[in-house]
Amino acid sequence: MSISPQEVKKLRDATGAGFGDCKKALDAVGGDFELAKKKLREMGIASADKRSGRDAKEGRVFSYVNKERVGLLLISCETDFVAMNGDFVTFGNSLIKQLVESGKDSLDEQQELEIKNLAATIKENIHVSKIYISNIASNELVKNYLHGEQSKIGVFIKLRVDDVLKIEDGSLNSLTMDLALHVAAFAPLYLSVGDVCPNYIKEQEEVFMKQMEASGKPENVIKGIVSGKLKKHLGEITLLEQGFVKDDKLTVKEKIEEVSKSILTKIEIIDFKYFSVG
């Protein structure tokens, strides 16, 4: 029999389940409203979707890397207790592995259903908040890092070298791992100053100028101070200009140049990502 949109909407309003799930449930039971509600409960969908309005401010970051790709996944939940739950952790590790191996940065219907079933089992609002997948070329080296027992911070960084034979070099691998730790510690927003939106730079400059208006200093002095403040601020939010985590006398850019000279090949950061809970 044909299921009308009005019937689907009625079931959706009653259960909070998604339009597609309601249509499937009604089709499965020949359009019987009560049986369709029961079907959704059996699937764990209705109860999970009713919880979807609750705040999910906790969670966990998952990561996986193979020879072809690296990925990060942030799954949100309501409590840190659930973020430590064995079923939750096992599911997250399995899901990020599936995503990396497939190269997909979005969930398919089966994966969406598995999340709803997990939410129904654990009885919390659980959802995927972020996914990021990045390919790895033969001359690129990746390190990922999850911080702490609860993995509330997860990062990866990807470096490229001109000489592919240097990929296994110990100094390069140590640098890459140190840079992953650096990203976790300092959470840069951009790779370089050139990546920062010009409008943001202009707005920030105006903020600093406003702050100096009441100083009474000459205009040329104010401009110099503002220029210094802006340079310092951009250095704090861009990875290459930040002080290196293991030696803040060097910027990250200078540390990369140092290692590059020592192993006789050009090194550059081409991608990084920082995920955090909350």
From Swiss-Prot:
One of its GO terms (cellular component) is cytoplasm. Belongs to the EF-Ts family. GO terms for molecular function: translation elongation factor activity. It is found in: Cytoplasm. Pfam families: EF_TS. Its main location: cytoplasm. SUPFAM superfamilies: Elongation factor Ts (EF-Ts), dimerisation domain, UBA-like. PROSITE patterns: EF_TS_1. Associates with the EF-Tu.GDP complex and induces the exchange of GDP to GTP. It remains bound to the aminoacyl-tRNA.EF-Tu.GTP complex up to the GTP hydrolysis stage on the ribosome. The keyword Kinase does not apply. This is Elongation factor Ts. It comes from Borrelia hermsii (strain HS1 / DAH). Transmembrane segments: none annotated. PANTHER family: ELONGATION FACTOR TS, ELONGATION FACTOR TS, MITOCHONDRIAL. Keywords: Cytoplasm, Elongation factor, Protein biosynthesis. Residues 79-82 are annotated as: Involved in Mg(2+) ion dislocation from EF-Tu.
